[in-house]
Amino acid sequence: MSKVLVLKSSILAGYSQSGQLTDYFIEQWREKHVADEITVRDLAAPPVPVLDGELVGAMRPGDAPLTPRQQDALALSDELIAELKAHDVIVIAAPMYNFNIPTQLKNYFDLIARAGITFRYTEKGPEGLVTGKRAVVLSSRGGIHKDTPTDLIAPYLKVFLGFIGITDVNFVFAEGIAYGPEVAAKAQADAKAAIDSVVAA
């Protein structure tokens, strides 16, 4: 039995294209892997806090007492990291907002990137500590960006996930959804076909 963690990050709730793909992924995964456990976390509701000057102090060990806000952020960080490490497959819904990932997803990454816990520095450079995982990224876009300089999402996620130790990453794209109903429908159909292949692998 595998444990699957699904991370939603769209601010559009039920109108989200990436959310629809995520729901389809969950439906197909449950059908093909009936014994697996699926956990869904919506990073936009409630939103993950922004890592600001106060909260960054909570992520670095020190002797100074933590403020209540820092204590809450540290507790959430611990919870998110424990959840991440406890799952085998990580599904990330990453719609493109202004060429990059949503703020909500970036805030999540800022809270789980902690030296000595999800990565460490060695004489040979950084080493990821979140190993043995498989990641699937579902990315919806209004335009066509795959394999072009305007796709900042795929390179960034490959680097970040690899940095914490997740190197087995598959991408599913739904592109051109702002180009009209026909293009959007084909994009969704193609993405669902790609999801079928990922689920069956």
UniProtKB/Swiss-Prot annotation:
SUPFAM superfamilies: Flavoproteins (SSF52218). Disulfide bonds: none annotated. Binds 1 FMN per subunit. FMN binds at S10, S16, Q17, S18, M96, Y97, N98, F99, S140, R141, G142, G143. Signal peptide: none annotated. Gene3D superfamilies: 3.40.50.360. Its cofactor is FMN. It comes from the Bacteria. GO terms for molecular function: electron transfer activity; FMN binding; oxidoreductase activity, acting on NAD(P)H as acceptor; oxidoreductase activity, acting on NAD(P)H, quinone or similar compound as acceptor. Its EC number is 1.6.5.-, 1.7.1.17. Keywords: Flavoprotein, FMN, NAD, Oxidoreductase. It catalyses: 2 a quinone + NADH + H(+) = 2 a 1,4-benzosemiquinone + NAD(+); N,N-dimethyl-1,4-phenylenediamine + anthranilate + 2 NAD(+) = 2-(4-dimethylaminophenyl)diazenylbenzoate + 2 NADH + 2 H(+). PANTHER family: FMN-DEPENDENT NADH-AZOREDUCTASE 1, FMN-DEPENDENT NADH:QUINONE OXIDOREDUCTASE. HAMAP family: Azoreductase_type1. Homodimer. Quinone reductase that provides resistance to thiol-specific stress caused by electrophilic quinones. Also exhibits azoreductase activity. Catalyzes the reductive cleavage of the azo bond in aromatic azo compounds to the corresponding amines. Belongs to the azoreductase type 1 family. This is FMN-dependent NADH:quinone oxidoreductase. It comes from Salmonella choleraesuis (strain SC-B67). The gene is azoR.
